[in-house]
UniProtKB/Swiss-Prot annotation:
Lineage, uppermost ranks: Viruses, Monodnaviria, Shotokuvirae, Cossaviricota, Papovaviricetes
Subunit note: Binds DNA as homodimer. Interacts with protein E1; this interaction greatly increases E1 DNA-binding activity. Interacts with protein L1; this interaction enhances E2-dependent replication and transcription activation. Interacts with protein L2; this interaction inhibits E2 transcriptional activity but not DNA replication function E2. Interacts with protein E7; this interaction inhibits E7 oncogenic activity. Interacts with host TAF1; this interaction modulates E2-dependent transcriptional regulation. Interacts with host BRD4; this interaction mediates E2 transcriptional activation function.
Keywords on record: Activator, DNA replication, DNA-binding, Early protein, Host nucleus, Phosphoprotein, Repressor, Transcription, Transcription regulation
Gene Ontology cellular-component annotations: host cell nucleus
GO molecular function terms attached to this record: DNA binding; DNA-binding transcription factor activity; nucleotide binding
Protein name, entry field: Regulatory protein E2
Length: 411
């Protein structure tokens, strides 16, 4: 057992040294995966013999050890094969030889040159997905390891092999639009290039092989040629699915980015919306018509037309945080995890000592939705006596703050 502990310690120490070394040589990464293989082989053998602790290391389940050992064996053998080719002399970082990158699409090949491609659906900036594309793919074939060039266009993510078979798509944005889009329109932004106004449901786009755009030839772009925009820049402003356009190396948007939420007029008259008014359907995001109406109004127009906020007094209408008369509150703040755990304990052990408790909330910045300050919850009480009983019997963990106040409804 002592020998197994020593071998396990050496394997783990080797991994730490190679990680800290940050080498760009493929031979060092082969040594790393050899150490991972040794570690999990020892843990698997120990678990099979009923050992749960080996040295200072807990032994995982045998299935976990077996799977990790298989991964290490595959990575070790693949890197050894790659090191015997002309690609073995290239610089390789440890991330380039990680299992997660090796198994990302397209699977079981080594990848370099990662960049992010942004796909915006329905012209809605809040409905955006990001995809990772690699410029170089090292793929194992029957003739050995070969280098393939990869990229993105209006159809999806692709790679081109040296055999000249054209673009091979391993991810298509049209299929993603079927999941995330309601109109079928999407635009693709890849560094300083944009493919705008693409529709996954239009007949001309669907009938062409591999989604070739109208600006391309009948055979599509030649293999290895840099992709061109699917539409001229001058026509982008009329496209419903195109918000960003290309302008040199920067990006210019056609108007301000819309806020993802749209509130009807008069909704700002009350801080608390009655829960008896359900929200039906998706929240609209097009704010352009409303912005034009607000610009045409005079500054005093809101004062001339007072907003009437309906007030529900019947308990049958639904839940009300504030009740008639004065209500007692306790505002509790702390870190997000502290507040969440505190609310859980209070609801479980002291539910009879208060009326209601809100979910965790944050104060947001003036611009955007960036959180400021600490997390907060608001607890309501039926009377000052109930609040005193709560403060007496419910301890407040260190690092959290509590403030008490009394409020009443104005309308």
């Amino acid at each position: 057992m002592e020998t197994a502990c020593e071998r396990l310690h050496v394997a783990q120490e080797t991994q730490m040294q190679l990680i800290e070394k940050a080498s760009d040589k493929l031979q060092d990464h082969i040594l790393y995966w050899t150490a991972v293989r040794t570690e999990n082989t020892l843990l698997y053998a120990a678990r099979k013999k009923g050992v749960t602790v080996l040295g200072h290391c807990r032994v995982p389940h045998s299935v976990v050890c077996q799977e990790r050992a298989k991964q290490a064996i595959e990575m070790q053998l693949s890197l050894q094969e790659l090191s015997k080719t002309e690609f073995g002399n290239e610089p390789w970082c440890l991330l380039d030889t990680s299992w997660d990158r090796y198994m990302s699409e397209p699977k079981r090949c080594f990848k370099k040159g990662a960049r992010v491609v942004e796909v915006e659906f329905d012209g809605n900036a809040s409905n955006t997905n990001w995809y990772t594309v690699y410029s170089k793919l090292y793929m194992r074939t029957e003739d050995g390891w070969q280098l393939a060039k990869a990229g993105a266009d209006g159809t999806g993510l692709y790679y081109c092999t040296m055999a000249g078979a054209g673009r091979i798509y391993y991810s298509r944005f049209g299929e993603e639009a079927a999941r995330f889009s309601t109109t079928g329109h999407y635009s693709v932004r890849d560094q300083d290039r944009v493919y705008a106004g693409v529709s996954s449901t239009s007949s001309d786009f669907r009938d062409r092989p591999d989604g070739v755009s109208a600006s391309e030839g009948p055979e599509g772009d030649p293999a290895g040629k840099e992709a061109e925009p699917a539409q001229p820049v001058s026509s982008l402003l009329g496209s419903p699915a195109c918000v960003p356009i290309r302008a040199g190396l920067g990006w210019v948007r056609d108007g301000p980015r819309p806020h993802p939420y749209h509130f009807p007029a008069g909704s700002g008259g009350s801080l608390l919306r009655s829960a008896s008014t359900p929200v039906q359907g998706p929240v609209p995001v097009d704010l352009a018509p409303r912005q034009e109406e607000e610009e045409n109004q005079s500054p005093d127009s809101t004062e001339e037309e007072p907003v009437t906020v309906p007030r529900h007094t019947s308990d049958a209408d639904g839940f009300h945080l504030l009740k008639a008369g004065q209500s007692c509150f306790a505002l509790i703040s702390g870190s997000a995890n502290q507040v969440k755990c505190y609310r859980f304990r209070v609801k479980k052990n002291h539910r009879h000592r208060y009326e209601n408790c809100t979910t965790t909330s944050f104060t947001v910045a003036d611009n955007g939705a960036e959180r400021q300050g600490q997390a907060q919850i608001l607890i309501t009480f039926g009377s000052p006596g109930q609040r005193q009983d709560f403060l007496k019997h419910v301890p407040l963990p260190p690092g959290m703050n509590i403030s008490g106040f009394t409020a009443s409804l104005d309308f």
